């Protein structure tokens, strides 16, 4: 009767929840997403690096990206420099020297190979304005004319490619030439040398700067398990700040910082940029040069809730060019996919501190990174990330088997004495204290420790969490097929039992997110139920009844999880069943063998 009531309660709760989702979708208006909103001209008067150090000038204004009131400005017309590498394709605007058009040639927006390529950087004035820019500020009190946002640069000719560097130049008409010497490698790294050539009779002092500007939020915000937004290494320490944190900090800057500054510091080298789940755009200054780095939120004065996010660097000390001399600084720009081997290569080659940590390995990075490397290696060996997950899970279970064997043996012994425990509960059901005393005495007599089954499992928790993290963040999992109907291990199982696996022409998940249950989560639920059947029931009857529904609950919970993670649980549960069954057979065989020997004696 109690089981029936519990089942009724859970069923009614699920029905109410689903009905609420359905009714709410029709009655309540859906929340409106804030439109992508480039910052206005007024907002663009924000300096690059906020309040500078003593002797450092206030840098020039950020280039206009929109008209007042939030209406996107016309995309700046003018000449462009084409960019072509094995992994990148795009162009750079010669008006303002903005790197603002870049696609990743190996990654598509959807699993279909005919879908558009991933657009990493986009032009100012578009709905998803996202660009990198370089410039100079003159020293305080100087009348030196420096390039501005509308400056039209002259290219040395040809497209920018790994085999063909390009130089952009501009003469200020007063004897000073500014140059941007651009080079790009075969992967994702640009090298930008900012040169000032002084043909005049007086010395020149300038402050080179670089910035990344993003005027829209990602469709899926960051979460507890994944950071999105500004990221960098300052003073040898990784510093992450989410979009909301930058926005809040920019509205309330620290004393001495310019408006919009959420974080600012002066240090040697390091790196800073804006990261997503799979992609990164980062500025990497010379590691031996003192620079001012900052995260900013540049609000639209007309609509303070809208604005742009900026990461920038400026030299802390001026760069001097004597008459007839040339002064230069070099900055690297990473713009591409967060592939561990590529990040590691750049970290080593250019001595970039903690550059690998652009991948969000999380708290357990000392575990997550080795798992990440192992899965990537296995995927290369077997040619399939799904097979790599299966092989890795088998290997992990074998390595952990000595640790969990104690737990499985304890659970087997607990299951063997379950009838005796139930008998004691029935006998002393009116005397709880005596009941617990007798049960403890039984445990002692049988040599069973209820906690022994749990303690060996504790060290596994960080490992399993790290594996979940890797499956969630690995770019190797993105659009990686497995077999049959699984075409993307980073996405949920596309099948759904509620439309008879595609036979009915509608999408139940449109009514409620709970109405999505694919084949793989169902298999996972079955394996979880089988594993639960081998475990001894909890001593508390109420807890035991609740545990009966855990496979059903987890099946629905994992219905919207990445197929790669569900595949791991399926394999892990199946191997656990085999291990438990083998140990239980051995544990039960020992008493039977002893009984047979006694009978023969």
From Swiss-Prot:
Gene: yidC
Protein task: Required for the insertion and/or proper folding and/or complex formation of integral membrane proteins into the membrane. Involved in integration of membrane proteins that insert both dependently and independently of the Sec translocase complex, as well as at least some lipoproteins. Aids folding of multispanning membrane proteins.
Gene Ontology biological process terms from the UniProt entry: protein insertion into membrane; protein transport
Renumbered residue ranges of the record's region Disordered: 34-63
Subunit structure: Interacts with the Sec translocase complex via SecD. Specifically interacts with transmembrane segments of nascent integral membrane proteins during membrane integration.
Stated name of the protein: Membrane protein insertase YidC
Membrane-topology descriptor: Multi-pass membrane protein
Localization per record: Cell inner membrane
Transmembrane segments: 10-30, 382-404, 455-475, 510-530, 549-569
Domain of life: Bacteria
GO terms assigned for molecular function: membrane insertase activity
Entry similarity comment: Belongs to the OXA1/ALB3/YidC family. Type 1 subfamily.
PANTHER family on file: CYTOCHROME C OXIDASE ASSEMBLY PROTEIN COX18, MITOCHONDRIAL, OXA1
Pfam family, one: YidC_periplas
Alphabetically ordered keywords of this record: Cell inner membrane, Cell membrane, Chaperone, Membrane, Protein transport, Transmembrane, Transmembrane helix, Transport
Compositionally biased spans, kind Pro residues: 54-63
């Amino acid at each position: 009767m109690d089981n029936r009531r519990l089942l009724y309660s859970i069923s009614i709760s699920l029905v109410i929840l689903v009905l609420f989702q359905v009714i709410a979708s029709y009655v309540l208006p859906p929340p409106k997403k804030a439109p992508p909103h480039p910052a206005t001209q007024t907002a663009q008067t924000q300096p690059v690096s906020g309040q500078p150090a003593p002797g450092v000038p206030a840098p020039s204004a950020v280039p206009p990206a929109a008209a007042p009131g939030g209406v996107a400005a016309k995309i700046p017309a003018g000449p462009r420099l084409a960019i072509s590498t094995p992994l990148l394709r795009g162009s750079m605007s010669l008006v303002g020297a903005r790197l603002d058009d870049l696609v990743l040639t190996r990654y598509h927006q959807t699993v279909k190979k005919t879908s558009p390529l991933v657009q990493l950087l986009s032009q100012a004035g578009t709905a998803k304005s996202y660009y990198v820019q370089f410039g100079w500020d003159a020293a305080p009190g100087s009348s030196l004319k420096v390039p501005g946002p509308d400056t039209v640069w002259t290219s040395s000719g040809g497209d920018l490619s790994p085999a063909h560097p390009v130089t952009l130049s501009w003469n200020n008409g007063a004897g000073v030439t500014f140059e941007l010497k651009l080079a790009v490698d075969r992967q994702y790294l640009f090298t930008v040398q900012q040169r000032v050539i002084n043909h005049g009779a007086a010395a020149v002092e300038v402050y080179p700067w670089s910035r990344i500007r993003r005027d829209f939020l990602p469709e899926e915000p960051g979460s507890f398990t994944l950071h999105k937004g500004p990221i960098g290494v300052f003073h040898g320490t990784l510093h992450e700040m989410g979009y909301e944190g930058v926005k809040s900090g920019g509205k309330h800057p620290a004393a001495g910082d310019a408006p919009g500054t959420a974080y600012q510091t002066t240090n040697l080298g390091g790196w800073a940029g804006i990261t997503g789940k799979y992609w990164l755009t980062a500025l990497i200054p010379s590691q031996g040069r003192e620079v001012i780095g900052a995260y900013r939120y540049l609000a639209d004065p007309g609509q303070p809730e809208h604005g742009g996010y900026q990461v920038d660097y400026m030299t802390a000390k001026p760069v001097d060019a004597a008459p007839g001399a040339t002064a230069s600084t070099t900055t690297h720009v990473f713009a591409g996919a967060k592939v561990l081997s590529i990040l590691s290569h750049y970290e080593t080659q250019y001595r970039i501190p903690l550059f690998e940590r652009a991948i969000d390995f999380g708290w357990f990075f000392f575990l997550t990174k080795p798992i990440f490397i192992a899965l990537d290696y296995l995927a290369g060996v077997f040619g399939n990330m799904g097979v790599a997950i299966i092989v890795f899970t088998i290997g992990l279970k074998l390595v952990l088997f000595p640790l969990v064997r104690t737990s499985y043996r304890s659970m087997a012994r607990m299951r063997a004495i379950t009838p005796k425990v139930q008998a004691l509960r029935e006998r002393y059901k009116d005397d709880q204290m005596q009941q617990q005393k007798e049960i403890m005495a039984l445990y002692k007599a049988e040599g069973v420790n209820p906690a022994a089954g749990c303690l060996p499992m504790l060290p596994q928790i960080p490992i399993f969490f790290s594996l979940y993290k890797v499956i969630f963040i690995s770019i190797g999992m993105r659009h990686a097929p497995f077999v049959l109907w699984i075409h993307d291990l980073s996405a949920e199982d596309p099948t759904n039992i509620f439309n008879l696996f595609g036979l009915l022409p509608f999408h139940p998940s449109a009514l409620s997110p709970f109405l999505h249950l694919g084949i793989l989560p169902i298999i996972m639920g079955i394996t979880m139920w089988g594993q639960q059947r081998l475990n001894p029931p909890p001593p508390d009857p109420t807890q035991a009844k609740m545990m009966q529904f855990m496979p059903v609950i987890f099946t629905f919970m994992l219905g919207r999880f990445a197929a790669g993670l569900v595949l791991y649980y399926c394999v892990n549960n199946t191997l656990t069943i085999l291990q438990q069954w083998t140990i239980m057979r051995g544990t039960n065989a020992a008493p039977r063998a002893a009984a047979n020997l006694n009978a023969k004696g």
